[in-house]
Structures are given as structure tokens and as C-alpha cells.
């Protein structure tokens, strides 16, 4: 596999079950080692760096809303941890007043009322609220790469749409480089500036710009059948078109 991302690329990733989408993200993040080749960010080879070191450059939001936050800590404490990602840590006075004001402003933009619950434990939040908070935390220090692994799949449709809209807004406003795995083909077409389709661990289709904007779900189904010699039989993608 060979994949190059340009600065500011917002790439949606689709493919059948077992196509290798999540595996690709896990290799980039350092969860799985690569057998050969290399992974570079801004020309720096990070292939041998452990996951915790890559976290300095890479933000990530998982499918499970329970991941990405510390349930037993307050909202503001979670944000403080994310704010200090990649920094040396020592003894201090905790969260400073100006930090609280900053977190309050950021939480207000989410439109979920979390700015009024900064002292609440994260474990008391709904799945959608936790996922929105995780997204905010993942982008707090503007990562060089944001990985989104079906991060709306476990949410109800209304909440999923809210989180997806927030995602699009944050990535666009901050000009982030992002990879978003999704099973929803409509979202894959409408969100981002580039789309890649995977099958059996390979990228079989890579489209961007106006060509992507003009795509339809039927085009994607036909492209998959053409490239793979099969169809999305019994696949969740058929339920999300």
C-alpha cells in the first residue's frame, strides 16, 4: 500500500468488512507494527516510534465513545490532559484560571451545554457528549494528523449527525489533515475533499476534487464491483447508502 496525504487533506475511507480500513489506522497510530516500508509525517520516519510517542503528532477518535476520555476525571481535567499533550509535565497548581476560560469557550462552541458542567465527571455524560468531547480533545493541540475510526457509528442518527457536523467544522476551520473511516457512503461523498476505497488491504480507488463531488452511491458500488470482482453483499455499507 502507498498513500500520500497533502496538508489539509480530509480523506474519507470506505470499503467492505475486513478491507483493512481500521488496520491501516492502527498501523499509522502505532498500535500494530508494520512488516515493511515506512510511515512518515512531515518527512520524519515514525515507523519505529511507539504509540505513546506518535500521540504527540496524531489525534484519534475511536468508534467506542468510552475510549479517548477518562471517565473518573472532570471534563476540565480531561481537557487539561489533552492541552498538555507532548509537553513535559511537572508539579504545578493544576488548572489555571485562564485555561478554564479557554476550555469554557471551546466547550460553548460544541453547543451541548458542557461549558456549564466543567466540574462534572466525564462518566456522567451521554455517548454523544463524550464523543464530541473526545473530538475536541483530539484537536486541541492541532495534530499533524487526525484519525477518525467510524467515530459516529455507535451513536443514534441525530447525535451522529451532530458529531459529524462538528467534525467537518473543526477539520475545515483548523485546516487539519484527517483520515475518516466510515460505512456511510453518502457521508463519504459529502464530507472532505478526497475519498479512497479499500479492498483486501489495498487502495482500489482514489478520487478528489470535482470528480469526488460529482460521485453518487451507485458510482461507488459500481466502482467496487469493477475493481474487486464482487459486490457489497451482506455488508453494513448497503445499510448506510
Language-model region placement:
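ABC ATPase C-loop
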Residues: 138-139
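ABC ATPase NBD coupling module
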Residues: 45-59, 67, 89-92, 96, ...
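Conserved ABC transporter NBD signature motif
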Residues: 37-45, 205-207
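H-loop/switch region of ABC-family ATPase nucleotide-binding domains
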Residues: 182-183
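ABC ATPase nucleotide-binding domains
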Residues: 212-241
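The feature captures the beta-strand-to-loop junction immediately N-terminal to the Walker
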Residues: 14-16
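Helix-to-loop junction immediately C-terminal to a conserved catalytic motif
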Residues: 29
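Q-loop/switch helix immediately C-terminal to the Walker
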Residues: 73-85
